[in-house]
């Protein structure tokens, strides 16, 4: 497990700056972790990363990645990319609104998720993944998660326990506006299909935040 946590801006109105090295077009830290992680069975990371964590940039001279032994993947990513751009967009309700980013930014989040989806195609024994971002205290979390049959989820569902299900499970906590593009959607549906069959429970879940009173709000 690696924790390189960097607090997201509490005030979404703040101007964010790039942390990329001068002259580089992708995050060298993310790319290095991608190379390192390919020998792991469990990869848990809380960090400030970009798409090269999952897939090489066109500016890299690297072979196609592969995670032949990876069973558990949990990535907590910052809502601001290393380039300084937000993975999310939103409009403040008024001049006092400091946390309004809440919908996926097609220009930044989609390429990040496409890289993630492509990476899952190279994880043949993956049993679970959680890709999450805490956007803000009130806004809550953006999450995508998958569990193979018999693998316990990271939280309890409000409508009942599906951990005993004999099929794969794919969950989205992404708000009411953003939806995955067709490639991401279809690729994530294929995770574990070859090992466990085509049956799949797929759900879009409700809002989860630290301020919510729902049981779904806590792991």
Per-range role (PLM):
Residues 1-219:
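Leucine-rich repeat
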């Amino acid at each position: 497990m690696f924790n390189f946590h960097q607090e997201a801006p509490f005030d979404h109105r703040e101007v964010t700056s790039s942390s990329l090295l001068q002259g580089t077009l992708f995050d060298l830290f993310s790319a290095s972790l991608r190379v390192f992680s390919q020998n792991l069975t469990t990869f848990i990371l809380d960090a400030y990363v970009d798409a090269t964590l999952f897939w090489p940039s066109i500016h890299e001279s690297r072979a196609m990645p592969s995670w032949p032994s990876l069973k558990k993947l949990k990535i907590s990513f910052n809502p601001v990319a290393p380039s300084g751009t937000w993975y999310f967009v939103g409009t403040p309700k008024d001049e006092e609104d400091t946390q309004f980013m809440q919908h996926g930014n097609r220009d930044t989040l989609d390429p990040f998720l496409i890289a993630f989806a492509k990476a899952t195609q190279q994880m043949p024994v993956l049993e679970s993944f959680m890709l999450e971002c805490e956007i803000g205290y009130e806004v809550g979390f953006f999450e995508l998660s998958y569990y193979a049959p018999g693998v316990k989820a990271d939280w309890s569902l409000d409508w009942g326990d599906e951990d005993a299900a004999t099929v794969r499970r794919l969950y989205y906590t992404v708000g009411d506006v953003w939806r995955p593009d067709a490639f991401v959607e279809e690729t994530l549906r294929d995770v574990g299909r070859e090992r466990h069959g085509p049956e799949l429970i797929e759900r879009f879940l409700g809002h989860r935040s630290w301020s919510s009173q729902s049981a779904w709000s806590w792991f």
